[in-house]
UniProtKB/Swiss-Prot annotation:
Keywords: Cell inner membrane, Cell membrane, Membrane
Cystine pairings recorded for this chain: none
Family, as annotated: Belongs to the UPF0161 family.
Function according to Swiss-Prot or TrEMBL: Could be involved in insertion of integral membrane proteins into the membrane.
Subcellular localization(s) per the UniProt record: Cell inner membrane
NCBIfam families registered for this protein in UniProt: membrane protein insertion efficiency factor YidD
Organism, as annotated: Trichodesmium erythraeum (strain IMS101)
GO cellular component terms, A-Z: plasma membrane
Name recorded for this polypeptide: Putative membrane protein insertion efficiency factor
Membrane topology designation: Peripheral membrane protein
Predominant localisation class: membrane
Amino acid sequence: MKVLLVRLIKGYKIFISPILPPSCRFQPTCSEYAMEAIERFGIFKGTAMAVMRILRCHPFHPGGYDPVPPKK
């Protein structure tokens, strides 16, 4: 299941993201963050972290460098 989610995100990056204007306010981008969070923390926690990150990615948030935290 983890592999499927990561492949879906990679598909988004290859096929959909180039069509849309750049809009992510963070480094790494939200899709890169989601892939890394899912790979590092698993499906449930990684997806929850990615959703929270995407909810913060809006014009009123300053953005900036926000890496996936290390696993404890």
